[in-house]
Amino acid sequence: MTMISTDGKSLLLALQIHFSGVFKAHLTFPKDYPLRPPKMKFITEIWHPNVDKNGDVCISILHEPGEDKYGYEKPEERWLPIHTVETIMISVISMLADPNGDSPANVDAAKEWREDRNGEFKRKVARCVRKSQETAFE
């Protein structure tokens, strides 16, 4: 993983995952960090159940602290001021390897992951990996 601060408020992350793909993401910190969580957005196309089609990452650790109005997450699973960039990255890398199909941000990717993991889902992931390799050094 490579991290570069681009403006003092956000990090550009290059994650080497998914069969040597290089996926870039921004981690943007609010003014009241660490009381509120940063936002993470992939800028490299990625096909994953917990990353929406705009690249926004949907993971409990990056959700606002407190009760989940939908009842899917426990308060202790959500953002706490003790979390660090390291704990965020560990959680995101774990999520990328083991998607949460119960709370998808990309419903189409979640459906393929459940029903055709080794077929269409794997083909789309492989396409994203190839594309990420082609643009890794841009």
For the regions a protein language model found, what residue spans apply to each?
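N-terminal onset of structured domains
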Residues: 1-24, 31-33
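Proline-anchored loop/turn motifs at beta-strand termini and strand-loop-strand connectors
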Residues: 28-37, 92
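A generic short-segment signal for beta-strand/edge and adjacent turn/coil regions
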Residues: 26-31, 61-63
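Short, exposed beta-strand "edge-strand" segments with a Pro/Gly-rich flavor and a Y/T-containing core
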Residues: 21-27, 79-83
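Domain-scale recognition of soluble eukaryotic interaction modules
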Residues: 11, 15, 39-138
